[in-house]
């Protein structure tokens, strides 16, 4: 039985997706830098504000005390590892391939910031009157949704494998 190629199992569609996602991420960050005040909440809807800040670490400002080149190297290693996973994953696993593309796009989006500025531009803030979530950006969202797509793919694959055994 041969594998059915999915859209993101082929190099050109995945490269185009990553490029479009990267351009969108950088364009939004450019607008954030140009028009949002620094560390001042701009309410959008209840519980959501735009809030420009800089992240010198990785997710949730972890490793913010580490040398910038260490973080750049770590991000490049993540991209290389995800590319390796993408190449080894069966071609019919749509959500896994979509997830890999999203993770690569997000990692590259934040890597561009790190290389250009020495920090990552964050600007999305979820909050209530007594609590607020970490400030993040579109690239972070790509990484999170991409990881979710891979988990979904694994769950679907497990269900498919179980039904084949019955």
UniProtKB/Swiss-Prot annotation:
Its EC number is 3.4.23.36. It is a multi-pass membrane protein. One of its GO terms (cellular component) is plasma membrane. The active site is at residues 122, 140. The keyword NADP does not apply. It comes from the Bacteria. The chain crosses the membrane at residues 12-32, 66-86, 101-121, 132-152. GO terms for biological process: proteolysis. It is found in: Cell inner membrane. PROSITE patterns: SPASE_II. It catalyses: Release of signal peptides from bacterial membrane prolipoproteins. Hydrolyzes -Xaa-Yaa-Zaa-|-(S,diacylglyceryl)Cys-, in which Xaa is hydrophobic (preferably Leu), and Yaa (Ala or Ser) and Zaa (Gly or Ala) have small, neutral side chains. Keywords: Aspartyl protease, Cell inner membrane, Cell membrane, Hydrolase, Membrane, Protease, Transmembrane, Transmembrane helix. Pfam families: Peptidase_A8. The keyword Signal does not apply. Belongs to the peptidase A8 family. NCBIfam families: lspA (TIGR00077). This is Lipoprotein signal peptidase. It comes from Sinorhizobium fredii (strain NBRC 101917 / NGR234).
């Amino acid at each position: 039985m041969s594998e059915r190629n999915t859209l993101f199992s082929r190099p050109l569609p995945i490269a185009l997706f990553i490029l479009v996602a990267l351009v969108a991420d950088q364009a939004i960050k450019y607008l954030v830098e140009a028009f949002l005040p620094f560390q001042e909440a701009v309410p959008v809807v209840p519980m959501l504000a735009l809030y420009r800040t800089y992240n010198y670490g990785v997710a949730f400002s972890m490793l913010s005390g580490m040398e910038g080149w260490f973080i750049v190297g770590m991000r490049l290693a993540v991209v290389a590892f995800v590319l390796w996973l993408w190449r080894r994953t069966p071609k019919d696993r749509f959500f896994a391939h979509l997830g890999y593309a999203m993770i690569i796009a997000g990692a590259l989006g934040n890597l561009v910031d790190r290389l250009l500025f020495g920090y990552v531009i964050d600007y999305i803030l979820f909050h209530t009157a007594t609590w607020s979530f970490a400030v993040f950006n579109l690239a972070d969202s790509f990484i999170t949704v991409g990881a979710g797509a891979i988990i979904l793919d694994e769950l679907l694959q497990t269900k498919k494998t179980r039904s084949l055994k019955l």
